[in-house]
Amino acid sequence: MFKTYRKLFFCVIMANVCGLASFAQQAPPAATTNYNPAEAFAPLFYTQNGNEFRSASGAPGSKYWQNRVDYNITANLDDVKHTVSGTITITYKNNSPDKLPYLWLQLDQNTFKETSRGYAITPPRSRYGAQGEKFDGGYKIENISVSQKTAAVKFSSMVEDTRMQIRLEQPMAANGDVITIKMDYSYIVPVSGSDRTSHLTTKNGEVYAIAQWFPRMSVYDDILGWNTLPYWGGGEFYCEFGDINFAITTPANHIVVGSGELLNPQEVFTGEQLKRWNAAKLSDATVHIRTEAEVTDPKSRPAKDKLTWKFKITNARDAAWSSSKAFVLDAARINLPSGKKSLAVSAHPVESNGTDAYGRGVEYVKASIEHYSKTWFEYPYPMAVNVATSISGMEYPGIIFCGWKDKKENVWGVIDHEFGHTWFPMIVGSNERKFGWMDEGFNTFINVLSSEEFNNGEYKPRPTAWHNVGRSLGNPALENMMLMPDGMAERNIGYNLYSKPGWGLELLRNQIVGKERFDYAFKEYIKNWAYKHPTPIDFFRSMDNGTGEDLSWFWRGWFMNSWKVDQSITEVKPFMKEARLAGYTIKVNNLEKMPMPIILQIKLKSGKTETIKVPVDVWMKNTSWLVRYNTTEEIKEVILDPEKLIPDGNAQNNRWVSDGNNAVSAPNIDGLLGTYSSAAIPIKITLSKVDGALTAQVPGQPMLTLTFDSGNKYIFEEGGIEVEFTADKTGFTLSQGGGSYVFTKDK
């Protein structure tokens, strides 16, 4: 509206001056800005429509499908040679609408071969790889067979790096065909395998953390078909869901913990341990199944040579386990919202025991699982096992591996983080190898809420330093969070996969859409994609639809790019009504590419302080915005983002303070009223008083309201117009667009 008035009013003036109507539209010099509303709020963020597989609302479509795989594994642990050997039967069901002439399997242990791609690209001192260990790494696979309905199937196989291809003579049929693959395999457990699997020497024996321990099916989906990115260590996993039965044979003096339910506790515990195990299922307090004092007591284990521990986990994408004769073992009941129960378990060497370490492990596991279950989605597994070992922190369904030397808040932090991964990616099965931020970032976000609640804030995290975050944005050395984990510098993984996406969700929840709407949409996303495979676009659509907001501007600026945020206060000016101070206009500029809501704290002369919030929508078509604040009292100070809740990378322009000369006296405009003419322009301007305000009008044109600026000056801000009266109020000089014109009051 204001721009229309400016054009109509000054086309008349300037056309008479120079005959050039376009000259009338010159604007005052604008603050230098990198912000482009058309870029930030550009439409067509989604380049494809929803379909019957993945709906436009972000939920799975009516014909969404995914394949299924079940595993049956028997394995042996040799604690002298540090080897795992076993036999696996894979039952694979093709629910896709496609025929499958070949199948792809993941052979993650092959990354530790000296001939592997992972070995070749892993730099010295990396967290990944085998930490320089020289050993005969990788799988040794024998006796592969393929069958359908007990009949043998002709096939050939090929191993390429960390992948195996099974080439079928006859393709698997679409929509439900089932095939069975069986093989024997073995491998040497690395001392440190990409900080995800390992064996640790303690004073009472070796602690084995066994993961990536069996050939797994790759995912075939409606996005890429076969997902065959090799395993190099940085990118984690993308796995199909199904049931996993596994039996682990170890020396009898070992205790084994694993994913899912322990099916035969009566066969592997002593009588006293079984009694304690069952008691723990009914206890909210920690029950010591095997105490620190009992670890070195031979009577604390059955007097046998070998024992087989049997586990089953259902509707899971993976399984892991740990074995040691050095374990202290604790447990307690987990209470779930539905009334169901699970079991919190902590297995750790005596070096990690104590109330300042994993002696509180069960307490931490229980609290973490109960919090996430009531807040987001119920925990699905019968046990939740923490193992203290040489791995700094790694998650698997129903079991996690944590750093054995951690203490106090670090123990809570690693347990809570790794069990938070139950929801991302164990339940919501995103593709970690391509989009690591979809599990690490989401998990980092929910960890903050969990830690705030635990034990009345015992380990409450420090608030996010948003202005520090803002200074990091746009730094090209930090790369982009949408890169694949294996495609970014290792030093940037923490920032891009964990911190920045976590901050993004925190911003959305606290500053942009609000907690109630965010939480509802986020829970709907989890519920809709539980045990399925969402993409980033599915997530973005889910949040848009669930919150009722088009958040394309946010996904574009924060996730797809790393745009900077910089808002500034340009000026604070009073306005009058009925010849009295009626309020102020506060001009805020958006100087960088990322828009954000405006948060202003206004302090009045009396000491009264008020905070107002302006939605991000004001930036849809503006690079600056006038915030109108009604008050009859003088403003002493204005601060942008006073509590530092927005990632503004430049706080130097966020504060305006009165210089003491800004006291507003109500000018008497009665002496200014009348009709004015200019010798240079054959036009008349009539100044009138309307609702106490000074207005200007050219015959036949809309009326403009002039705002008092200072001294004898009035302005029309949007048009860049200044009207400065003579001291005797018999005339004024009108300035706009670099031109000045003298008007004199008619007699």
Regions found by a protein language model. Give the residues of each.
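Hydrophobic alpha-helical and helix-loop surface patches within well-folded domains
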Residues: A24, Y35-R54, V69, F311, ...
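A surface-exposed beta-strand-loop module
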Residues: A27-Y35, T83, K93, K99, ...
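Beta/coil-rich, acidic/histidine-enriched accessory regions frequently appended to metallopeptidases
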Residues: V80, N528-P667, I685
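Short, hydrophobic/aromatic-enriched beta-strand segments in well-ordered soluble domains
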Residues: I88-I90, N94, L105-Q109, D177-V191, ...
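Solvent-exposed beta-hairpin/edge-strand motifs
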Residues: L100, W104-T150, A211, T249-H254, ...
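Glycine/proline-rich low-complexity spacer/linker segments in large multi-domain proteins
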Residues: T115-G129, S186-I244, P265, K644-A666
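Hydrophobic helix-coil surface modules that form long, contiguous segments used
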Residues: M217-L224, G235-D416, F445
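Peripheral terminal and inter-domain segments
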Residues: P595, L604-K608, K613-P615, N622, ...
